[in-house]
Amino acid sequence: MPTWVACVARVQVDRETGRVMVEKLTLVVDAGTIVHPDGAKAQVEGCSLWGLSMALYEGSEFVNGLPKDTNLDTYTPLRMGDVPEIEIELMPSSEAPVGLGEPATTVVAPAIGNAIFAACGARVRHLPIRPETVRQALRS
């Protein structure tokens, strides 16, 4: 059995700047029998924050074959001030335990993209979701 994860994001979108602020992530996880609930929730929380960082902040650009960002002053992963409220529900199960390593990472970006569409009608389809991308989608 694979690990199943669902995610819903609550966002605010600034229509002028295109900035997206994630207020809350809610994740529901079915990973079979959970042996250590606190550890499982911590793993899901960390993975969801990694997914959030990749969805909104992380992305490498290259100029003339060289990386544009060579240090953390210009390459901006998720910062503590951008961490939203996170709610995690672990589904009860009698199935064998399965991995929690990365599954929660993959559902965050689609949840944010759908939340942006629900909030303002802008459909974004590329990562990372930058303010310029949201502004462009709003104009479309």
Annotated model-derived regions:
Residues 1-140:
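C-terminal catalytic domains of large/alpha subunits in multi-subunit enzymes
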